Regions:
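Membrane-interface "cap" regions at the ends of multi-pass membrane proteins
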Residues: 1-38, 227-230
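Extracellular loop-to-transmembrane helix junctions
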Residues: 44-74, 83, 94
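Structural signature of hydrophobic alpha-helical transmembrane segments
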Residues: 56-57, 123-137, 199-207
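Hydrophobic, small-residue-rich membrane helices and short re-entrant helix-turn-helix hairpins
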Residues: 146-160, 213-247
Length: 252
């Protein structure tokens, strides 16, 4: 707890900005959650109760552990990203390969996180989806070039609270409105269309159980925590919270 964090020993007012543990937790939750623990569990529910089992086991023993270690490794390496940490230990060639892999992964995830909300907003408003694509890209640009506490630090906590509120509301509906789920429990190893649960359930439900993409996000908040003792609550805890959200959506 007495070891200075990157935000304390090398603040730059841009990426390395000290923020409160609660705010960092909420930002981390929204960073790793988004659409992932919604779409993935809904699709994974086709495999039946095995989806619930995977979310619980995967989240507790794999996903949360992965997020904690990726975040704390970044803290110990002065807020470095995964390619830099890998390169420090395995050499420059592996660093370059990891950087290419991370860029490709981020492009793929970015496309989903642009097309998904834009399509949904287009359906709700009747406006052209490209308008929302342009708005989302404009936000991406501003959030990238401005200090982390100017947009991300102010907007993300609000939307993270909304995400939690939505999940709690759905849980309340399940608990108090008499809805049933998996009333006729049948443990199968395939979906209704015949797709095998192994290995498809593990890649269908990634966010909410275990996602390597989170390793690209954890360093963002590793640069903002003010004490290493908060690492478990922020990195491990945010993944557990995402798992709970995923469980709620699986039951729907």
């Amino acid at each position: 707890p007495n070891r200075p964090t990157p935000a304390c020993k090398m603040p730059d007012g841009v990426d390395y900005v000290e923020m409160s543990p609660t705010k960092v937790f909420l930002i981390q939750l929204l960073n790793i959650a988004g659409l992932g623990p919604v779409f993935g569990p809904i699709l994974g529910a086709l495999y039946g109760p095995i989806a619930l089992l995977w979310v619980v086991i995967g989240c507790v023993f794999a996903g949360a552990v992965h997020d904690y270690f990726s975040g704390m490794l970044s803290v110990r390496y002065n807020g470095k990203s995964v390619p830099d940490i890998v390169g420090y230990n395995l050499g420059d060639l592996i660093k370059k390969l990891m950087r290419v892999f991370a860029v490709v992964l981020l492009i793929l995830v970015g496309v989903v996180f642009v097309a998904g909300p834009a399509g949904l907003l287009s359906q709700l408003t009747g406006m052209h989806s490209m308008l929302f694509v342009a708005i989302i890209f404009a936000y991406y640009f501003l959030a990238t070039i401005l200090p982390v506490d100017k947009i991300i630090g102010r907007v993300y906590p609000f939307f993270a609270v909304l995400l939690v509120f939505m999940a709690v509301g759905l849980l309340g509906a399940l608990a108090f409105k008499g809805y049933t789920f998996y009333s006729n429990i049948e443990w199968t190893m395939h979906s209704p269309s015949g797709l095998p649960a192994w290995p498809l359930v593990f890649i269908t439900i990634a966010c909410g159980a275990c996602s390597g993409f989170h390793a690209t996000q954890s360093p963002l908040m590793a640069r903002c925590i003010n004490n290493e003792k908060h690492g478990r609550k922020i990195f491990y805890g945010a993944m557990i919270a995402e798992g709970v959200i995923g469980l709620i959506w699986v039951t729907l």
